[in-house]
């Protein structure tokens, strides 16, 4: 019986070492050598400190910043570990809301967001990105139309001409991946950092 078990155990050990240790370590080393910034998490640094990642959205609620998509991520309630509380852009608990199209809770949230956005920019159609969440709750990007919709609010809050901000948004637009995958997009963190830089000039 041992003669039958020995080859199986040797194969199990060899495959575990190859697929569980050698391959992941080789890929990590290769990624670090070829794409060092991406392998480190695509971190964005300003003035010697890390301000975020280009891959994970952040919560911006101030009027002088562009806002990302709504996030419905949660965190454990400090008062009751059996419950959760809203914690937008909580990277430790990436998820969507799981609310379906017939959900009254979802309908009320969208209506509230639509009303607030319509009051902010009357007469302009509200882009869908600004009222819908992403599957992860951590989407760092919005459509160019969603960024342009917010230009009047940011311009008023910063005392800047709208045309300068529109030009900045246009300059921040990233094309489709490989020219065919996904949609054109604007990274909200990168855009807000560019707005801060423009305001300092």
From Swiss-Prot:
Pfam families: KdpC. InterPro entries: KdpC. One of its GO terms (molecular function) is ATP binding. The chain crosses the membrane at residues 7-29. The keyword Manganese does not apply. Its main location: membrane. It is found in: Cell inner membrane. It comes from the Bacteria. Keywords: ATP-binding, Cell inner membrane, Cell membrane, Ion transport, Membrane, Nucleotide-binding, Potassium, Potassium transport, Transmembrane, Transmembrane helix, Transport. One of its GO terms (cellular component) is plasma membrane. It is a single-pass membrane protein. NCBIfam families: kdpC (TIGR00681), PRK00315.1 (NF001454), PRK13999.1 (NF010603). Part of the high-affinity ATP-driven potassium transport (or Kdp) system, which catalyzes the hydrolysis of ATP coupled with the electrogenic transport of potassium into the cytoplasm. This subunit acts as a catalytic chaperone that increases the ATP-binding affinity of the ATP-hydrolyzing subunit KdpB by the formation of a transient KdpB/KdpC/ATP ternary complex. Belongs to the KdpC family. The system is composed of three essential subunits: KdpA, KdpB and KdpC. This is Potassium-transporting ATPase KdpC subunit. It comes from Methylorubrum populi (strain ATCC BAA-705 / NCIMB 13946 / BJ001).
């Amino acid at each position: 019986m041992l003669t039958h078990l020995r080859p199986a155990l040797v194969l199990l050990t060899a495959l575990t070492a190859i697929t569980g240790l050698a391959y992941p370590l080789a890929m990590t080393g290769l990624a670090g050598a070829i794409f060092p910034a991406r392998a480190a998490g695509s971190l964005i640094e300003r003035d010697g400190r890390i301000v975020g990642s280009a891959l994970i959205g952040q919560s911006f609620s101030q009027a002088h910043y562009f806002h990302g998509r709504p996030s419905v991520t949660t965190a454990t309630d400090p008062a009751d570990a059996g419950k959760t509380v809203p914690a937008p852009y909580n990277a430790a608990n990436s998820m969507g809301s799981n609310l379906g199209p017939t959900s009254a809770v979802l309908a009320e949230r969208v209506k509230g967001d639509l009303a607030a956005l319509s009051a902010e920019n009357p007469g302009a159609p509200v882009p869908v990105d600004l009222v819908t969440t992403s599957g992860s709750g951590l989407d760092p990007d919005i459509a160019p139309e969603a960024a342009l919709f917010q230009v009047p609010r940011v311009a008023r809050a910063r005392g800047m001409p709208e045309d300068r901000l529109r030009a900045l948004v246009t300059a921040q637009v990233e094309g489709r991946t490989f020219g065919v995958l996904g949609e054109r997009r604007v990274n909200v963190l990168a855009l807000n950092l560019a707005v801060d830089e423009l305001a300092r000039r």
